[in-house]
UniProtKB/Swiss-Prot annotation:
It comes from the Bacteria. Keywords: ATP-binding, DNA-binding, Metal-binding, Nucleotide-binding, Repressor, Transcription, Transcription regulation, Zinc, Zinc-finger. Binds 1 zinc ion. One of its GO terms (biological process) is negative regulation of DNA-templated transcription. InterPro entries: ATP-cone_dom (IPR005144), NrdR-like_N (IPR055173), RNR_NrdR-like (IPR003796). NCBIfam families: transcriptional regulator NrdR. Residues 49-139 form the ATP-cone domain. Its cofactor is Zn(2+). This is Transcriptional repressor NrdR. Negatively regulates transcription of bacterial ribonucleotide reductase nrd genes and operons by binding to NrdR-boxes. GO terms for molecular function: ATP binding; DNA binding; zinc ion binding. PROSITE patterns: ATP_CONE. Belongs to the NrdR family.
Length: 151
C-alpha cells in the first residue's frame, strides 16, 4: 500500500478491526520507509443488481420501489411497518445471496407473494392482482379459490 506521506510502496499492517456494521475492515498500517502510520479500509465491492422487466428492459434494483409496492398491498391492514421492512430486508438479502448480476422481475414478484401469503391473505391477493395483472373478476376469483384450497 502506497504511503500517503513519503509514497513508498511497502507497509505493514499493525492493527485490523471490523467496522461497526461489519461491512469493512479498518487497517492501521505503518510505512516501512518513513515509519508514519495511516489507515486504510477494505470492503467487498458491491455488484449492482439489474432487474429484467417483463418487456425486456433492464433497470437497477430499487429497494424503495419494492417497499412501496408491498406497502400499497398492505394499506389499511393490521401489519406493522417493521414487518413490512423485514420482508423487504429478507428479499434483498436473498437476492444478494443469489450472487447474480441480473434477476427477472417475475422472480422478485414470486418472492413477495410467498411472504405476503404467510403474513396477510388480503395483502397477498392485492399484490397478486397487480403482479399477475388480473384482467377480470374471474381471474381474481380463481386466485382466491387457489388460496382457499391451500389452507
Amino acid at each position: 500500500m502506497k504511503c500517503p506521506y513519503c509514497h513508498h510502496l511497502e507497509s505493514k499492517v499493525v492493527d485490523s478491526r471490523y467496522t461497526k456494521e461489519h461491512t469493512s475492515i479498518r487497517r492501521r498500517r505503518e510505512c516501512l520507509n518513513c515509519g508514519e502510520r495511516f489507515t486504510t479500509y477494505e470492503r467487498i465491492e458491491d455488484i449492482p443488481l439489474m432487474v429484467i422487466k417483463r418487456n425486456g428492459q433492464r433497470e437497477f434494483f430499487d429497494r424503495n420501489k419494492l417497499l412501496t409496492g408491498i406497502m400499497k398491498s398492505c394499506e389499511k391492514r393490521p401489519i406493522p411497518q417493521e414487518k413490512i421492512e423485514q420482508v423487504v430486508d429478507d428479499i434483498e438479502k436473498e437476492l444478494n445471496n443469489k450472487m447474480k448480476q441480473e434477476i427477472a422481475s417475475t422472480e422478485i414478484g414470486e418472492m413477495v407473494m410467498e411472504r405476503l401469503k404467510d403474513i396477510d391473505e388480503v395483502a397477498y391477493v392485492r399484490f397478486a392482482s397487480v403482479y399477475r395483472q388480473f384482467k377480470d373478476v374471474n381471474k381474481f376469483k380463481q386466485e382466491l379459490e387457489r388460496l382457499l384450497q391451500e389452507d
